[in-house]
């Protein structure tokens, strides 16, 4: 599991995740992800296009981070999940808690 952070126009931070958000993958990036997303209140796009699998521990990480940002006045948008990952998120009802869109560009528009 890998995480990469890039700055987008509009003071938006893009966190690109690549790999499997299973037990091992989540443990491999959880501290870095939490540090990136809790350093400051802001606008974050979590790019899930590179995530091939999502387990409950990965869902917990995403929800915890989004709630933390919301509590500080920030916002998180999940972007571009692959069909399997989208299905897991929708089945778990995460799309009702955290905005989820089809592309990074749509996420930027949501955060504008």
Each predicted region: which residue ranges?
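Amphipathic alpha-helical interaction surfaces in cytosolic regulatory modules
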Residues: 23-98
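Short, charged, intrinsically disordered terminal tails
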Residues: 106-112
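Short beta-strand/loop segment at the start of cytosolic alpha/beta domains
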Residues: 1-16
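Acidic phosphotransfer microenvironment of two-component signaling modules
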Residues: 83, 105-106
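Residues in well-ordered alpha-helical elements
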Residues: 27, 104-105
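Short acidic-hydrophobic, aromatic-tinged amphipathic segments that line or gate anion-handling sites
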Residues: 99-103
